[in-house]
């Protein structure tokens, strides 16, 4: 009789979120991208040691790169190398998605930022979004709308 295989599950699936991006930008369209990582980075992601604040996506030579994201190294996982926490990481997107994103980012007012990093099976995926910046009055209107939705739910719940 065959031995039962133990499936290792990751807690939650979400590694990191960029809540600041949802506050500062209007999200036009979302994309899912793979990331090219080193071994010590994957071990650090399993421990949940990633920060997406102040990170963004840049395009060079027809390729997309994640710039400014921090993956803090584990002391036990990176003993033989000197890890760089904020290195630029290549994003894996299809040609059609790359062309669509590059065309939109070249327009005035659009940029591309990461929203979340999560596990999809044994792979690390990054949710990136095509965004447009918010003005201060837009942020206030969004906050007022969120408060009204919360109050409305509280009233109807009674």
From Swiss-Prot:
Disulfide bonds: none annotated. The keyword Cytoplasm applies. Keywords: Cytoplasm, RNA-binding. It is found in: Cytoplasm. Transmembrane segments: none annotated. SUPFAM superfamilies: Small protein B (SmpB). One of its GO terms (cellular component) is cytosol. CDD domains: SmpB. The keyword Transmembrane does not apply. Pfam families: SmpB. NCBIfam families: PRK05422.1 (NF003843), smpB (TIGR00086). Belongs to the SmpB family. This is SsrA-binding protein. It comes from Acinetobacter baumannii (strain ATCC 17978 / DSM 105126 / CIP 53.77 / LMG 1025 / NCDC KC755 / 5377).
């Amino acid at each position: 009789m065959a031995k039962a295989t133990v499936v290792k599950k990751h807690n939650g699936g979400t590694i990191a979120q960029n809540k600041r991006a949802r506050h500062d930008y209007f999200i036009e369209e979302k994309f899912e991208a793979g990331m090219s990582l080193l071994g010590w980075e994957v071990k650090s992601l399993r421990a949940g040691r990633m920060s997406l604040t102040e990170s963004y996506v840049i395009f060079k030579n027809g390729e997309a790169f994640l710039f400014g994201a921090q993956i803090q190294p584990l002391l036990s996982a990176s003993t033989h190398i000197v890890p760089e926490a904020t290195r630029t990481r290549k994003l894996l997107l299809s040609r059609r998605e790359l062309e669509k994103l590059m065309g939109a980012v070249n327009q005035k007012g659009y940029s591309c930022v990461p929203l979340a990093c999560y596990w999809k099976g044994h792979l690390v995926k990054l949710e990136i979004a095509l965004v447009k910046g918010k003005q201060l009055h837009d942020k206030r209107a969004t906050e007022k709308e969120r408060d009204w939705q919360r109050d409305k739910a509280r009233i109807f719940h009674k």
